[in-house]
Amino acid sequence: MKILDACCGSKLFWFDKDNEYTTYMDIREESFEIHGKKVNVTPDVVADFRPMPFDDDIYDLVVFDPPHLKSAGPNSIMKAQYGQLDKNTWPDDIRQGMSECMRVLKPTGTLIFKWNEAQVSLKDVLNVIPHQPLFGNRRG
């Protein structure tokens, strides 16, 4: 089984942060401390999720947990851990990211899309992505 975490950040939701079947990708690689908390962003591949450096149809499972904040202060822990969307281009960025996830996913594969509605509603996200989910949380 081949797994891709396309926006791994500091791998917060992973129990096994070094899973042998997983390729961890993020646009940044850095370690720092903010408000007394250590943050380590250590991907296997440093790349943007919009033009992924992978062949088509190679992953059985893709996790797409992109940044969800459009605005954050310079000392925001959430921004430090998860990154930040561009407030003007986020719809196109998310659309491109979802398209890339589907491109690298095998036809029989599974995509897990994780979203936080703190600043952008799920409804707004669903309006810009090219593929609609089969199931999920309908609160948005």
Regions from the PLM with identified roles:
Residues 1-140:
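Class I S-adenosyl-L-methionine-dependent methyltransferase catalytic core
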